[in-house]
Amino acid sequence: MARWRRGGTPAHGVWAGIGITVLAIGVIALSVQALQQTGAQATGSTATPKPTFSFGGPAPVPSDESVTGTPTPSRTPAAGDTGAPGVDERFLAVGEGVLWRGTAGACDADAPVIELSYDSGATWDDVTPTYRGIAQLRALATFGGPHAEAVADLGDECEPQAIRTFTAGEFWEPYPDQLAAWTYIDPTDAGMIVTPDGSIEAPCAEPWGLRARGGVVALICDGSAYVQDADEWAPLVQGGAAALSVNAAGAIAIAHTADTCAGVAISRYEDGTTDEIDCAEGADPQDSAALAFAGDALLLWSGDTVVTLG
């Protein structure tokens, strides 16, 4: 027989009500905890760091799938051709844990492309600032670690502007005050080079492959590589030059053809002397190419491949 509390409520009914209340509180607590854990996992998934790499050895060769949709321009002129690559001219720059590359394009012709890679060049992301009306790429470099900057012709008037990105290429902004610090080929007169100290005349009417750093200016004219020496242009490699790079110490690397190399030869100019230092065997010297210093090593972008030399 059930015991009754004063007021007419059975004792076991009270305990049942308390049990139900405790159970409900427990369920609510568990639900809140589960939601908190789910929210933490979702937040963490958006903050996964991008992979980094080192230049300790050869960069992986991109597979056919990894290069789909990426620029792989090349020219196939007759042997001995020394013409400028034009819209197919290439640029390569090394940042902190990232590679940047680009193709020149041209106003009223093929558009340029700018890409970045976090895996030594195996895969690339297109970060071309098309929304800025980019029409031609004239220079590409890195600064402040992984960030990139460039000189590019923008807008309907194809005016050269200095642009920078601090967001891995997601956003590019013009920096008008930086343009005067750059060295680039004059868009109104290809035979002239614009420098921070004024314009200088190139050794030919159609120079290309221009690279400048720390006051050192090098370029390619009629297939030969030159460096500015006082008021004159001194030849570095006679014929077959394909790409140049200048490091912070003023050394110049030249990619070119040579009888000693079944591919693309690499020479280094320093302290007034040019020496052949490496050979990228199997690389096609007729392909458009770009060269970049990476510490003590060199990176060569030729065909679909970025390889490490030295």
Give the positions of each predicted feature:
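Repeated scaffold domains used in trafficking and secretory/extracellular systems
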Residues: A84-V94, R132-F143, P176-T188, C204-G214, ...
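Entry beta-strands of beta-propeller and related beta-repeat scaffolds
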Residues: E96-R101, G144-V151, G215-V217, G250-A253, ...
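Conserved Ser/Thr-centered positions that define the repeating blades of beta-propeller domains
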Residues: S117-Y118, I163-F166, V227-Q228, A265-Y269, ...
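Intrinsically disordered, low-complexity segments enriched in Gly and acidic/Ser/Thr residues
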Residues: I220-Q286
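Blade-level signature of beta-propeller repeat domains, shared across WD40, Kelch, NHL, RCC1
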Residues: A290-G310
